[in-house]
A protein has these predicted regions:
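Active-site nucleophile/metal-coordination loop of metallo-enzymes that catalyze phosphate/sulfate
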Residues: 1-44, 51-110
């Protein structure tokens, strides 16, 4: 088994689930530059398909041709643990798991 090196880890940064709602809010309100490179728009549609993942979409694109051919789609990185509860909390709060406290199907009480 190989050792995990710091270089193997992805540092937090633009392009995570917690960046999505703040980026849309900034773009819609003019409250700063739109993060994530969102196009100018008066409204956005956010579609979540739980558990799909970009790799699954690429592998099974013949089963979801409409989703596979959508333009202006961006890959977003989820945090660890990559559970639905943690990911939805990141999207809804714009915060990382250590900040919002939902770490899997348990939560950290302040």
């Amino acid at each position: 088994m190989s050792s995990l090196l710091a270089a193997d880890l992805m540092p937090p940064g633009p392009g995570t689930l917690s960046d999505l709602v703040p980026a849309m809010g900034q773009a819609l309100t003019g409250g700063g530059p739109a993060g994530l490179g969102l196009p100018d728009a008066t409204r956005y549609v956010f579609l979540l398909v739980d558990g799909m993942g970009q790799e699954n979409l690429e592998q099974f694109r013949h089963l979801a041709p409409t989703l596979s051919e959508m333009e202006n789609c961006h890959d977003l990185t989820c945090y660890v643990p990559s559970t639905t509860a943690t990911s939805l909390s990141c999207i809804g709060t714009g915060a990382v798991p250590g900040r919002h406290g939902v770490v899997g199907y348990t939560f950290r009480a302040p």
